Each structure stands twice: as structure tokens, then as C-alpha cells.
């Protein structure tokens, strides 16, 4: 009786191990190509005047060409002053061919920020209308 149970269980165990060893199928995104900030709120802990922070700009699909995206500061929604409290390295971001991420590089000026300040600014991506995802939008708030 024990031999018969082992004869059934051993092949069953081997079959389970064989099936578990198969490569899983990964679900990939196949929808439209959108460009957006990876988050809608970023916090920069500015500790010196030389550190840069990367604010990721992401695309939902990789392309075989470079994508240039313009970045602008919305002054009406900002209380930090560009050039005094922070600076943006470039007003454009490049998402390179075959990649999904480009970065807006921002530097904060610690010497011009008081510990009592509550500063922030709002960024907006300038993208073609067909690359704008209505669900997430193209803006991000940055707290300094």
C-alpha cells in the first residue's frame, strides 16, 4: 500500500515542480503613448547649495526616437522664486530612444531658504495633446 502511494505521489510532486519552473508571462502595457510626471508631489530636502534632485518624467511606451518635452513653471501656483530658492537645469527633458524615463534636474539653494519657509512651485509639461493622459495630467507640485 505504501509503495502504491509513493508511486502516485512522487510523479505528482515532480510534475508540480516542473510546472512551477516554467517562465511566467508578464503583462505589458499596450495602450496609447502618454508622457507625464511619475508623481504629482515631490519633496526636496535641501541640505546644501550643490545637490540636484531628479524629478522623473515618464512615458508609457518606449519609442525608437528621442522625445523632447518642454517644462515650464506655473508662477501663479508657486511661492518659491526661481533663481533665488531653486533653479531648473534645463527647461526641456529628453526621453531617449528605447527608454521610458527622463529627468527634470532641480537644485535648491539652502542659503536662501529659512527653516520657517514653506516654499513650493508647480511644474507643467508641454506635450502634444495626444500624449496627455487626462487621468493624471501634466503637472507636478514640488515642495522645497
Residue ranges and their predicted role:
Residues 1-4, 14-47:
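Bacterial Sec-dependent N-terminal signal peptides
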Residues 1-7, 142-144:
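Ser/Thr/Gly/Pro-rich, low-complexity flexible regions
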Residues 33-144:
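First exposed extracellular module after export/assembly in secreted or surface-exposed proteins
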Amino acid at each position: 500500500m505504501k509503495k502504491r502511494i509513493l508511486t502516485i505521489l512522487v510523479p505528482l510532486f515532480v510534475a508540480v515542480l516542473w510546472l512551477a519552473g516554467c517562465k511566467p508571462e508578464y503583462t505589458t502595457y499596450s495602450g496609447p503613448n502618454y508622457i507625464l510626471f511619475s508623481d504629482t508631489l515631490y519633496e526636496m530636502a535641501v541640505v546644501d547649495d550643490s545637490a540636484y534632485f531628479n524629478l522623473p518624467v515618464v512615458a508609457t511606451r518606449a519609442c525608437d526616437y528621442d522625445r523632447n518635452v518642454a517644462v515650464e513653471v506655473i508662477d501663479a501656483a508657486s511661492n518659491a522664486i526661481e533663481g533665488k530658492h531653486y533653479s531648473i537645469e534645463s527647461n526641456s527633458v529628453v526621453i531617449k530612444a528605447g527608454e521610458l524615463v527622463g529627468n527634470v534636474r532641480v537644485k535648491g539653494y539652502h542659503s536662501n531658504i529659512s527653516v520657517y519657509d514653506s516654499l513650493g512651485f508647480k511644474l507643467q509639461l508641454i506635450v502634444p495633446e495626444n500624449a496627455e493622459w487626462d487621468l493624471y495630467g501634466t503637472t507636478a507640485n514640488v515642495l522645497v
